[in-house]
Amino acid sequence: HDASTFGIFGGVMPQHRDPLPPGVADLVISSAVVPSACTQWDVEEITVLGVQHHAHLVGKRLKVEVTRDGEYIGEMRREKVYDFNHQSSEESSVKKLKRGDELTLTCSYDTSSKTTPTNFGDFTQDEMCLAYFL
């Protein structure tokens, strides 16, 4: 049996995304869409064991959804209350990804306590939006 990991990066560095504006309690960004052309694996399907979300301090909610041939399949994982200090990998609700599936990563942010824009970047005070799969 083979095993591997892959990720969706919906905003990691400043050149990937505009800064998040300050003072917004629920800022939703459909951060990354992996089109079906990018999931043309050598096999018909892969089994996903787990999904791990990652954001920084103003990240509040994250989810990964699957669409197959234009039909919504479901959420692989939804994190309703993201906490930077308690990150974990969780079992995927969608167990099988098929060749050609489209994946969408959506991240929500709360910048209501900020007075200046929040940049994307590596530092904890910056922000990110990504998901890893096993």
Annotated model-derived regions:
Residues 1-134:
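Beta-strand-centric surfaces of beta-sandwich/beta-rich domains
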